[in-house]
Curated annotation (Swiss-Prot):
Pathway: Amino-acid biosynthesis; L-tryptophan biosynthesis; L-tryptophan from chorismate: step 2/5. One of its GO terms (cellular component) is cytosol. The lineage of its organism: Archaea, Methanobacteriati, Methanobacteriota, Stenosarchaea group, Halobacteria. Its EC number is 2.4.2.18. It comes from the Archaea. One of its GO terms (biological process) is L-tryptophan biosynthetic process. Binds 2 magnesium ions per monomer. Anthranilate 1 binds at G78, N109. 5-phospho-alpha-D-ribose 1-diphosphate binds at residues 78, 81-82, 86, 88-91, 106-114, 118. Mg(2+) 1 binds at S90, E223. This is Anthranilate phosphoribosyltransferase. InterPro entries: Anthranilate_Pribosyl_Tfrase (IPR005940), Glycosyl_Trfase_fam3 (IPR000312), Glycosyl_Trfase_fam3_N_dom (IPR017459), Glycosyl_Trfase_fam3_N_dom_sf (IPR036320), Nuc_phospho_transferase (IPR035902).
Length: 331
């Protein structure tokens, strides 16, 4: 560990395997001082795609994992930490994608970028967010959707709580959540809090067992946006394609960011329920259609992003998305 600290402090980059080994040390035997020193040195130098991938692999190595007999598995977990307090997009989108027929292994946590994260909203809605791995695996197999709370599946992360809190700044761990799905998701829509991270995270994903993914940043949002353009890196096997996406490309209208503002966990849960029942329409529904459509697209259930939006609309209007929400609550 000391060797890694000295090298990174000196400006050297770690390989994927070295970063993976450093992560192992962080979770197993490094002191808090060593952990803090390494994280600070990486931040000062700037984490490379290989280092992020290596840390993600090391975090997966230490995780409790599941292997649902369903596939391809899709996740909509993003980094959080964006500039806006919106409705909870990733969770609602995941339920809509599940309603469209995707097998969803939703990875999430409590709030980072909004008043309520995935776990906050689902907990208020009556979902057992702290379900053990075997229960989540069965839920995905039986219902086509399950929620994996990060602290339950990544107990080794306790080792970095103290150092991260004392450092008081973003570290490599701020981007690892979406890269460490405990079910080994095959397809992802992965929102990031900074546009500069889009190509970096896309390259990091190339080291992970993901077949299809969209890494997105929507003009300040870690989601596909309606208020402005979205920067996208699309991963399809070994190929990465970068482009810009507008609401018009999806057949949707632009809307100001204020139109999709979030609130308390209860208010966000009410919006989630309302979108799924059809009682909430307009920009909030459209924002979910955009992001659920992307998940449907990477799951292979639509030939285009705009086609994914149409499938998402049908999943809501038919009641299928609401049925998935009910099944998750009853599991």
């Amino acid at each position: 560990m000391q060797d890694y600290i000295e090298r990174v402090t000196g400006g050297a980059d770690l390989t994927v395997e070295e970063a993976r080994d450093a992560a192992r040390a962080v979770f197993e035997d490094a002191t808090e001082a060593q952990i803090g020193a390494l994280l600070a040195a990486l931040r000062a130098k700037g984490e490379t795609e290989a280092e992020i991938a290596g840390f993600a692999q090391g975090m997966r190595d230490a995780a409790l994992t599941i292997e649902p007999d369903r596939g391809p598995l899709v996740d909509t977990c993003g980094t959080g930490g964006d500039d806006y307090n919106t409705i909870n997009v990733s969770t609602t989108s995941a339920l809509v994608a599940a309603g469209a027929g995707a097998a969803v292994a939703k990875h999430g946590n409590y709030s980072v970028s909004s008043s309520s994260g995935s776990a906050d909203v689902l907990e208020v809605a009556g979902v057992n967010v702290e379900a053990e791995p075997e229960s989540v695996e069965a839920c995905i197999e039986d219902n086509g959707v399950g929620f994996m709370l990060a602290p339950v599946f990544h107990p080794a992360m306790k080792a970095v709580i103290g150092p991260r809190k004392e450092l008081g700044m973003r570290t490599v761990f701020n981007v690892l959540g979406p890269l460490t799905n405990p079910a080994g998701a095959d397809a992802q829509v992965l929102g990031v809090y900074d546009a500069d991270l889009v190509p970096v995270i896309a390259e990091s994903l190339s080291h992970m067992p993901v077949e299809r993914a969209l890494v997105v940043h929507g003009s300040g949002m870690d989601e596909i946006a309606l208020h402005d353009a979205t920067t996208v890196a699309e991963i399809d096997g070994d190929e990465i394609t970068e482009y810009t996406l507008t609401p018009a490309d999806l057949g949707l209208e632009r809307a100001p960011i204020e139109a999709v503002a979030g609130g308390t966990p209860q208010e966000n849960a009410d919006d989630l329920e309302g979108i799924l029942t059809g009682d909430v329409t307009g920009p909030k529904r459209d924002l979910i259609l955009a992001n659920a459509g992307a998940a449907i697209y990477v799951a292979g259930l639509a030939d285009s992003l705009e086609g994914g939006v149409e499938v998402a609309r049908d999943a809501i209007d038919s009641g299928a998305a609401k049925a998935k929400h009910d099944a998750l609550r009853e599991a």
